């Protein structure tokens, strides 16, 4: 399971991580999620609460989980979350 800090950082997208119907979640800009369903179909969801501050906090939390650093001078990070979800972050500092 996820610890409280990780669960809080993932809260805005948790509803899309839990169902096994999604094979990929892409966030290319704040407030917009793109979801790939296992059938290969894509959908876009507007999620205003997924703002820049929330995304940055998620990236820092994910990096900390695996002993990496995510900062303005190091804005690229790849890791796996507990549960095996792959995360790739390229920050827009």
What are these regions (language model features)?
Residues 1-73, 78-82:
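N-terminal accessory targeting/assembly segments
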Residues 85:
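P-loop NTPase nucleotide-binding module
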Residues 89:
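Conserved hydrophobic/aromatic pocket- or pore-lining residues that grip, position, or stack substrates
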């Amino acid at each position: 399971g996820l610890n409280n800090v990780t669960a809080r950082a993932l809260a805005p997208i948790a509803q899309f991580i839990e169902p096994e119907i999604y094979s990929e979640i892409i966030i290319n800009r704040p407030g917009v999620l793109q979801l790939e369903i296992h059938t290969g179909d894509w959908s876009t969801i507007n999620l205003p609460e997924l703002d820049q501050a929330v995304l940055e906090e998620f990236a820092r939390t994910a990096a900390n989980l695996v002993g990496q650093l995510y900062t303005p001078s190091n804005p690229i990070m790849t890791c796996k979350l507990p549960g095996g979800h792959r995360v790739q972050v390229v920050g827009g500092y």
